[in-house]
């Protein structure tokens, strides 16, 4: 069984919200996952109403479960890989 770590879209129109899930690679993106290991909110939120620049995106991830699934051979999608690289959970992909 090929297992992937990918994003499953939830939320409403113009307001996406993603669950970071471990799922069979051959199933539909909205099919029931094996496990949900985190969430990702791509729309930045203002920290303070007076500050115009500081914004933050909400990412919650169970790092222990992420590392476990990577260790047993789960392949992260490109988006999940880039998120994991930002937090140094995976080494940067070599540029060829």
From Swiss-Prot:
Biological-process GO terms, alphabetical: mitochondrial translation
Keywords: Mitochondrion, Ribonucleoprotein, Ribosomal protein
Signal peptide positions (record): none
GO CC terms in record: mitochondrial small ribosomal subunit
Subcellular location: Mitochondrion
InterPro entries in the cross-refs: Ribosomal_bS16, Ribosomal_bS16_dom_sf
Domain of life the protein comes from: Eukaryota
GO molecular function per UniProt: structural constituent of ribosome
HAMAP family from the UniProt entry: Ribosomal_bS16 (MF_00385)
Family: Belongs to the bacterial ribosomal protein bS16 family.
PANTHER family the UniProt entry points to: 30S RIBOSOMAL PROTEIN S16, SMALL RIBOSOMAL SUBUNIT PROTEIN BS16M
Primary role: Component of the mitochondrial ribosome (mitoribosome), a dedicated translation machinery responsible for the synthesis of mitochondrial genome-encoded proteins, including at least some of the essential transmembrane subunits of the mitochondrial respiratory chain. The mitoribosomes are attached to the mitochondrial inner membrane and translation products are cotranslationally integrated into the membrane.
NCBIfam families (alphabetical): S16
Subunit structure: Component of the mitochondrial small ribosomal subunit (mt-SSU). Mature yeast 74S mitochondrial ribosomes consist of a small (37S) and a large (54S) subunit. The 37S small subunit contains a 15S ribosomal RNA (15S mt-rRNA) and at least 32 different proteins. The 54S large subunit contains a 21S rRNA (21S mt-rRNA) and at least 45 different proteins.
UniProt protein name: Small ribosomal subunit protein bS16m
Taxonomic classification: Eukaryota, Fungi, Dikarya, Ascomycota, Taphrinomycotina
């Amino acid at each position: 069984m090929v297992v992937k770590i990918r994003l499953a879209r939830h939320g409403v129109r113009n307001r996406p919200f993603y669950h970071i899930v471990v799922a069979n690679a051959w199933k539909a993106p909205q099919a029931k996952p094996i496990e949900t290991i985190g969430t990702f909110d791509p729309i930045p939120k203002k920290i303070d109403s007076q500050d115009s620049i500081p914004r933050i995106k909400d990412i919650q991830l169970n790092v222990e479960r992420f590392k476990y699934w990577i260790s047993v051979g789960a392949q992260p999608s490109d988006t999940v890989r880039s998120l994991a690289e930002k937090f140094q959970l995976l080494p940067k992909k070599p540029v060829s």
